[in-house]
């Protein structure tokens, strides 16, 4: 369900050493399955463990997950990264905003899942997003840009070198390309 890197496990063990005995961590999703979903990690003292919690055992501690959050934490990963700027705990949960769709689901559902779980989080750093309008009979994913991507001078590069390449790699033989139907209006909202 959740992968915790060795570095993150060591970090949690160090943090938990300063907590009362029996304290573990809790991994959770607030508003799971919605665009507002947010993931978090907190301390979980023994008296906060619920009877329906799922206990994931790691080296020196356990991660508690509430039953409601569990399906949205499938394929989640926690890492502790150190670089020149310092250290950072990262939690990636690709299914937090929407559940992963089955591999035999209709193409539009699978493409929408990739857009919401992988592409839009990347575009969000620029205040942008895309929406799947349709998939044509020819296999072209028709997209509409929003937010900071609308009117951005880099939208063609983002579309062809980023989004199209990623979608064609993920859906070979099913998608033949992407097209943009956005009426781009450059303004203060545009990223560049």
Curated annotation (Swiss-Prot):
One of its GO terms (molecular function) is iron ion binding. Keywords: 4Fe-4S, Iron, Iron-sulfur, Metal-binding. This is Fe/S biogenesis protein NfuA. GO terms for biological process: iron-sulfur cluster assembly; protein maturation. Binds 1 [4Fe-4S] cluster per subunit. The cluster is presumably bound at the interface of two monomers. The keyword DNA damage does not apply. Its cofactor is [4Fe-4S] cluster. Involved in iron-sulfur cluster biogenesis. Binds a 4Fe-4S cluster, can transfer this cluster to apoproteins, and thereby intervenes in the maturation of Fe/S proteins. Could also act as a scaffold/chaperone for damaged Fe/S proteins. [4Fe-4S] cluster binds at residues 149, 152. InterPro entries: Fe/S_biogenesis_protein_NfuA, FeS_biogenesis, FSCA_dom_sf, HesB-like_dom_sf, NIF_FeS_clus_asmbl_NifU_C. Homodimer. HAMAP family: Fe_S_biogen_NfuA. It comes from Shewanella sp. (strain ANA-3). Belongs to the NfuA family. The keyword Iron-sulfur applies.
């Amino acid at each position: 369900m959740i992968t915790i890197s060795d570095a993150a496990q060591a970090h949690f063990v160090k943090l938990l050493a300063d907590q009362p005995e029996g304290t573990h961590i809790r991994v959770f999703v607030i508003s799971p399955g919605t665009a507002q979903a947010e993931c978090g990690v907190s301390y979980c003292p023994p008296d906060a463990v619920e009877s329906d919690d799922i206990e994931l055992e790691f080296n020196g501690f356990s991660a508690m997950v509430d039953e409601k959050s569990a399906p949205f934490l499938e394929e989640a990963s926690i890492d502790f990264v150190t670089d020149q700027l310092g250290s950072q705990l990262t939690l990636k949960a690709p299914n937090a905003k929407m559940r992963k769709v089955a591999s035999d689901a209709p193409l539009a559902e699978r493409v929408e899942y990739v857009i919401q779980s992988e592409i839009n989080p990347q575009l969000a750093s620029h205040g942008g997003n895309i929406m799947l309008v349709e998939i044509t009979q020819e296999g072209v994913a028709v997209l509409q840009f929003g937010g900071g991507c609308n009117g951005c001078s880099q939208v063609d590069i983002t579309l062809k070198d980023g989004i199209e390449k990623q979608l064609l790699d993920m859906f070979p033989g099913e998608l033949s390309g992407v097209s943009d139907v956005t009426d781009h209006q450059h303004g203060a909202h545009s990223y560049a």
